[in-house]
Swiss-Prot record:
Alphabetical list of HAMAP family matching this protein: ATP_synth_epsil_bac (MF_00530)
Localisation: Cell inner membrane
Listed GO MF terms: ATP binding; proton-transporting ATP synthase activity, rotational mechanism
Name of the molecule in the record: ATP synthase epsilon chain
Family to which the UniProt record says this protein belongs: Belongs to the ATPase epsilon chain family.
PANTHER family named in the record: ATP SYNTHASE DELTA/EPSILON CHAIN, ATP SYNTHASE EPSILON CHAIN, CHLOROPLASTIC
Organism: Francisella tularensis subsp. tularensis (strain SCHU S4 / Schu 4)
Length: 145
């Protein structure tokens, strides 16, 4: 019996940014962690900034996504995002600096509500980048200090 793979497509406003096949896609949706395999029931979910793992046989592509929407059919996973980067292209020092800058804004008692919302968003994105980076290296990353 031949193995059946999901078609996986990650699209941004610029077009397709990742295309491949997978026997398993794992990600965090609005309802929690999901593992998606060929034949999965149809669903539509929002995605926070986070990590998407696309596994085919023994190889896993680790992707950082800025958040978006995932559409699942029994044979296809389509992820629509504003931004996506492969974990191997992420810069740990930049992500750590972004995280530190966001935390400084959040510590500022004079920060406006708008600044706090933007800092919270940047903090979540930096944490997701670090998680993608570290999971691609086989490490576990906790956002707690």
């Amino acid at each position: 019996m031949t193995k059946k793979y999901l078609k996986v497509d990650v699209v941004s406003p610029l077009g397709s940014v990742f295309k491949g096949e997978a026997d398993m896609v794992s990600l965090r949706g609005s309802a929690g962690e999901m593992g998606i395999a060929y034949g999965h029931t149809e669903l539509l979910s929002t995605l926070p900034a986070g990590v998407v793992n696309v596994r085919k046989d023994q190889h896993t592509d680790v992707l950082y996504v800025s958040g978006g929407i995932v559409e699942v059919t029994p044979t296809r996973v389509t992820i629509m995002v504003d931004d996506m980067e492969r974990a191997e292209n992420l810069n740990q020092a930049e992500a750590e600096k972004a995280r530190a800058r966001a935390k400084e804004v959040l510590k500022n008692p004079d920060a406006s509500k708008l600044d706090i919302e933007a800092a919270n968003k940047r903090l979540k994105e930096a944490d997701a980048r670090l998680k993608a980076l570290n999971s691609s290296n086989g490490l576990y990353y906790s956002k707690d200090d």
